[in-house]
Amino acid sequence: AFTPTLHGKQLIVVEDLVSKKGILHPVQEAMVKFHASQCGFCTPGFVMSLFSMYKNQSSYSEELIKDSISGNLCRCTGYRPIIDAAKSLNKTIKTDHFNKNIKKTISLLKKISSKSISIIQNNKKYFSPKTINELKKIIKTNAHPQFLSGGTDLSLKVTKNREEIQNIIYLNEIKELNFIKKSKNHIEIGANTPLIRFEKFIYKYYPDFNSILKRYGSVQIRNVGTIAGNIATASPIGDTLPILLSLNAKVFVQTKNNIKEILIKDFFISYRKTKLKSGEFI
């Protein structure tokens, strides 16, 4: 159901980390050197989390390391050697076969069409609009669509309940919905704004909110999850909802004809039910 969301992106899995010549990636070498793999069941996840940290940061403090691996669980409780392995990366020369091929990779990605996507096959539909206007047009011709952004909640319906989602509209390519605006009296957060971006922004104004967001899932979840998704699913375990309720936040909803403003305390009706009608979106 979610495979088309990979369009235009580079997918790197743990098997890709070893070079074609069989040379281990610096992250893998560190894990071996510090005996950071116990039973091995969780090792691929830790390796990929540290690989992401390795590629996106220039130095690795213990706080950053712990945050980077927070989405992984080692039942053997072998965290000390894992953290030691990660710290040792500060002493390595930051290069790998991905860096050597980066120009080629970027060139290939640029050749991929960036136009909106529409897939209809075997009674299943998938749309990926680029603008709000395109989204509105798709909604008009598709009854009861399932909106998808980060998919951190929706994906459980597929992986746990084995549900088949027939009519998906992927929102993550709509840049108009990815923003943070601050005025004198309030902060506006776009529906598509990743939690990780908001987490970094909000520290200056509400450090306690930042602290809570750091406990929200893991870096992987916060990289794709959105506050609007947290609100729209009306989950009783939505991490941001108690804070948004206490701040008397407002939700802006696009209806068929206009945009309406709803106090968040009035937005929720009951368990996993909101005032959003079919075709309306935040």
What residue ranges belong to the model's regions?
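Extended heptad-repeat alpha-helical coiled-coils characteristic
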Residues: 17-19
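S4-like RNA-binding module at protein N-termini
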Residues: 1-14
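C-terminal structural segment of proteins
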Residues: 10-13, 26-32, 36-37, 47-58, ...
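Membrane-interfacial loop-to-helix junctions in multi-pass transporters
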Residues: 22-24
